[in-house]
């Protein structure tokens, strides 16, 4: 039996389908899915991991022995050598957490434990016990084992962990490595025909990153959490890459806050030629003094004609873009409305389904082994691409653009198979379309842009307008992304007269530096060496999760600013990108074989120890900064009862948000909150004067609400939507009424005889509600219409309606058919019939 081990279950399934001579048979070993098939007369089986199957953690205890010095002790009592600095206190200690008579309890989140935690030994523990058990069961029976995890640092580390586990079960079976850049039949066949050895150096580089991130993340997070203000909830997160990334965002915000806007004036003239209106700004783009602008306005006042003083035309070439690597893909997708984190999730899905190549790459140069002609032929199956692909194929020899980064592990991101909008979900196709068009653009000719500059004179005052025209579309025919809209100009000749319709003077102010978009931040992180192609998007996502940042473009919260200010004041190297970038370089040197893992990890421990020594004496000052910041972020307005702050709070029991008074328990004022992202607003309710909030529910536009449930703006009249089907079965007549709870603001439908029949249905919380005279044919509940920004939506409000299960099955079938490229019958809408009432 040949055993193939992949990083994920879906990869195991796909590889089995692509390699098998016979159809792959799905099976289970214990609870883990496996796929069996035959190839070359042998039995093969594939099994997928769930990412990392082992995870690093600190030993729970450090013990000091007079003869042997410090040792770490794992959960089973096994001693692990430890290298603890001599300047840290040694036992005997008084029994007071985190200390025990003979050592230190590292599990205790206490300030005194942190200097020891920096140097504590790290052990690898099983993370996926069921999968490991299944893996070992298969390994025992295997004649040979092939590791087929992703080919990058993380994939090689997972492969190394797999190697450790399988050797415990079978230390004689030969083990090889399959490396591939796309999940297509050709690429997988090539990889399994040309097996190599596991790259130990690359795996060690991955393990060093894992260990360093654990050490820095655990120590800094525990420090911030220990000093946090009790009552404001969660762990305060920090990390080796996360913190300097946040520092970039805060530094930009500081620039904006320090920016002093200056007034200036602009003058825009309106013109007409033939049937086309157009506008042109004055040749002086900005007037710093209003008096100078007024002089121009006096000169042109009353004028009705303008003369075309000059028409200048210049042609310039615009070169096609270079191939996508991970960073440039995330930046381009961000400009199209896809966040970096979502882009990578979609890219991973497209890769697993065989539509694009491996999406985590630095390379921007297509290797000579990549068959560009074959890829063009494949994607030309999409009618939207066919004319462009065929035009490129007619060129004969294809010449691709080249970026600055060339690596040998994976090619740049490119399409590997044809896809159409019918085969993919809208967001998936949006990303696939971007990648496919970029690929064709890299093989296309330069675009030629003809720039036109027209100078018009009105009573000797010059107005200048510029416009660009694509003289030769080149790559822009297939890749329109990033095109700027230009002023449309009529055909004008020097000396011509055009109609002058007047001028407008507008006062403006200079703008502060723009906040980072997620795409721009990804690019800045790459430039500064923060994180890797595989981690940058998740670091940004983490900053949002822990509420250090909000919105896009990215704005730091008061808490995010306070964390950077506190750490930057007492431990500036923690917030600087330089130290993190240097550590990244050292980890890269491990992969190259020029540095050892232990040497790099020890260096990182020493750096952190110095920063921690600066932080601990100032923990009270850090605490005060965090207290003020959390309170500022949580502030909603003054309490109407006691005058103290109303604050956004999280319930310890339900984890749902509410508004509570900072004077609790002396003041018991609270207000419920609807589900969704909540943001306090400065503007007060115009009806009752109470604070307002902005609520953004999932997949909905933001709404502004008054926090007081008793406010008239929160009330809705009761609406009769039909007759109760439960009462009707018992020969009674009772109405179903839609109403809004005055306390929670939740909407629902209930029978007026609810105490007896208990019939009730939930309702969507947003949208105008309209009754119909129809009932659901499946359950008899009244059909209602909810009108939102997306338009009207007719629904049965009964969550237990049998028709909903049928709809769900149809959706699943349609989704499955989309994935396999098959067409499905048109879905029938839920039908209704006229109510008898």
Task: Kindly label every feature range from the protein language model.
Residues 1-3, 165, 221, 258, ...:
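Basic, low-complexity terminal or inter-domain segments flanking catalytic cores
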Residues 149-151, 331-333, 360:
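Short glycine-centered, acidic/aromatic-flanked micro-motifs in structured strand/loop junctions
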Residues 181-186, 326-327, 346-356, 539-542, ...:
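Short, conserved phosphate-binding/catalytic loop or strand-edge motifs used
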Residues 141, 183-269:
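C-terminal or mid-to-C-terminal helical accessory/interaction module adjacent to the motor/catalytic core
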Residues 1-216:
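Intrinsically disordered, low-complexity regulatory segments
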Residues 120-123, 149-151, 169-176, 196-203, ...:
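Short, polar/flexible loop-turn hinges at active-site or ligand-entry regions and domain interfaces
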Residues 41-47, 51-124, 233-348, 352, ...:
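Long, highly charged, low-complexity internal segments
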């Amino acid at each position: 039996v040949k055993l193939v081990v992949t990083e994920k279950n879906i990869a195991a399934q796909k590889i089995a389908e692509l390699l098998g001579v016979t159809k792959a048979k799905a099976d289970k070993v214990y609870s883990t899915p496996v796929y069996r098939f035959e190839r070359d007369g042998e039995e093969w089986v594939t099994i997928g991991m769930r990412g990392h199957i082992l995870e690093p953690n600190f030993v729970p205890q450090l013990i000091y022995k007079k003869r042997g010095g410090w040792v770490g002790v794992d959960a089973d009592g096994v001693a692990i050598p430890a290298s603890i600095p001599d300047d840290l206190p040694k036992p005997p200690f008084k029994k007071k957490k985190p200390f025990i008579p003979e050592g230190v309890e590292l599990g205790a989140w206490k300030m005194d434990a942190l200097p020891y935690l920096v140097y504590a030994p790290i052990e690898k523990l099983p993370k996926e016990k069921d999968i490991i058990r299944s893996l070992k069961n298969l390994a025992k029976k295997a004649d040979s084992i092939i590791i087929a995890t992703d080919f990058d640092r993380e994939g090689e580390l997972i492969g190394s962990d797999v190697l450790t586990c399988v050797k415990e079960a079978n230390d004689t079976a030969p083990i090889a490595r399959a490396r591939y850049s796309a999940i297509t039949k050709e690429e997988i066949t090539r990889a399994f025909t040309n097996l190599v050895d596991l790259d130990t150096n690359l795996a060690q580089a991955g393990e060093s990153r894992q260990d360093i991130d654990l050490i820095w993340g655990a120590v800094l997070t525990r420090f911030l959490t220990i000093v946090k203000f009790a009552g404001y909830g969660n762990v305060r997160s920090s990390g080796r890459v996360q913190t300097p990334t946040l520092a970039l965002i805060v530094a930009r915000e500081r620039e904006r806050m320090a920016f002093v806007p200056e007034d200036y004036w602009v003058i825009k003239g309106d013109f007409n030629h033939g049937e086309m209106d157009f506008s042109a700004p004055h040749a002086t783009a900005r007037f710093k003094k209003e008096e100078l602008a007024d002089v121009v306005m006096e000169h042109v006042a009353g004028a009705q004609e303008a003369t075309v003083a000059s028409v200048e035309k210049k042609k310039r070439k615009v070169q096609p873009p270079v191939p996508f690597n991970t960073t440039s893909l995330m930046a381009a997708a961000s400009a199209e409305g896809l966040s970096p984190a979502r882009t990578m999730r979609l890219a991973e899905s497209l890769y697993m389904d065989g539509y694009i190549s491996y999406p985590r790459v630095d390379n921007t140069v297509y290797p000579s082994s990549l068959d560009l002609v074959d890829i063009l032929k494949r994607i030309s199956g999409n009618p939207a691409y066919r004319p462009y692909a065929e035009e490129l194929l007619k060129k004969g020899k294809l010449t691709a653009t080249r970026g600055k980064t060339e690596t040998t592990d994976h090619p740049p991101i490119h399409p590997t198979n044809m896809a159409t909008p019918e085969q993919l979900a809208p967001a998936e196709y949006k990303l696939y379309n971007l990648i496919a068009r970029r690929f064709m653009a890299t093989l296309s000719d330069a675009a030629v842009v003809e720039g036109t500059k027209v100078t018009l004179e009105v009573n000797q005052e010059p107005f200048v307008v510029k416009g660009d025209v694509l003289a030769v579309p080149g790559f822009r025919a297939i890749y329109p992304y990033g095109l700027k809209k230009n002023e449309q100009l009529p055909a004008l000749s020097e000396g011509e007269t055009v109609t002058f319709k007047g001028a407008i003077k507008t006062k403006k102010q200079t703008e502060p530096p723009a906040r980072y978009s997620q795409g721009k931040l990804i690019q800045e992180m790459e430039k500064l060496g923060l994180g890797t192609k595989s981690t940058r998007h998740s670091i940004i996502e983490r900053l949002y999760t822990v509420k250090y940042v909000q919105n896009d473009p990215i704005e730091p919260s008061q808490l995010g600013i306070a964390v950077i200010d506190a750490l930057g004041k007492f431990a500036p190297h923690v917030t600087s990108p330089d130290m993190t970038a240097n550590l990244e370089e050292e980890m890269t040197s491990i992969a190259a074989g020029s540095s050892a893992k232990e040497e790099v990890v020890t260096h990182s421990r020493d750096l952190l120890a110095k920063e921690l020594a600066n932080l601990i004496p100032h923990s009270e000052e850090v605490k005060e900064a965090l207290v003020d910041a959390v309170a500022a972020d949580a502030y909603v307005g003054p309490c109407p009862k006691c005058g103290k702050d109303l604050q956004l709070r999280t319930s310890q029991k339900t984890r749902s948000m509410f508004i509570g008074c900072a004077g609790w328990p002396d003041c018991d004022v609270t207000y419920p909150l609807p589900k969704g992202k909540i943001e306090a607003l400065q503007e007060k309710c115009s009806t009752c004067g109470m604070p307002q909030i902005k609520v953004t529910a999932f997949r909905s536009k933001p709404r502004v609400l008054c926090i007081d449930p008793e406010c008239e703006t929160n009330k809705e009249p009761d609406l009769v939507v039909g007759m109760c089907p439960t009462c009707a079965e018992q020969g009674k007549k009772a109405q179903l009424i839609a109403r809004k709870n005055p306390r929670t603001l939740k909407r629902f439908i209930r029978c007026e005889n609810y105490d007896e029949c208990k019939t009730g249905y939930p309702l969507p919380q947003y949208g105008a509600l309209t009754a119909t005279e129809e009932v659901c044919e499946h359950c008899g509940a009244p059909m209602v219409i909810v009108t939102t920004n997306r338009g009207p939506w007719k629904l049965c409000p009964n969550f237990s309606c049998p028709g909903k299960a049928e709809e769900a099955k149809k959706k699943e079938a349609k989704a499955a058919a989309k994935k396999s490229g098959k067409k499905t019958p048109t879905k029938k809408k839920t039908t209704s019939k006229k109510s008898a009432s």
